[in-house]
Amino acid sequence: EHLLELAEKGNKPFTESLNPGVEHVLGIRVPDLRKLAACIARTDWERFLETSDTFYMEERMLYGMVLGCIRPDEDLEVYLHRVTCFVWMINSWSVCDTFKFAGGQRFVDRHAGRLWEYLKQWMNADGEYEVRFGVVMSMSYFVDEAHLEELLACYDSIRHEGYYVKMAVAWALSVCFVKFPERTMEYLKNNSLDTFTYNKILQKIVESCRVDKDTKTLIRSMKRP
């Protein structure tokens, strides 16, 4: 009922246009869902996770948002099991990309080794949104000095044909370029990416406001036919 009330002040046609082919979209604004998730996290959130439905896209999104608002379980594996249950229900890029780990960067730093291995497993999964989850989350938390080389290798090894996987890899590698331009440039000159993904990376780099004009000119010249 609460979701249906929020849907009344949302924009269903716009949300559907952003998520083509996804059924049962209510069109609720993301900030409204985040507020609701924060409220649920302060109450009986475990009961919510156990009884939550997945009919509407926004119900799936809300499930992930609640996982990002709660205090993570003392046992990391219990929390990751909850996250895994969420990943299995992802049915759109927007459900995937609105997720954040509970506890923020401090939580990630404290459990970096296990979380890194966890995300690598998703990058090797079969499902389109499972792989996207691994790519987007690794981009969000692990584009750093310690993980860059392995991260580039992971992205380069992905062979999934899903559109939303390719777009995620392109996005992630453009972020790598902004943060580590020289080392990512070396990678761009010698990689095994398909042409669509490779050219999308270049496009995203050119569109970035954090890349200078001369570099953008060079990047444009690297496009594959």
Task: Enumerate the predicted regions with their spans.
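Alpha-helical scaffold domains
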Residues: E1-P225
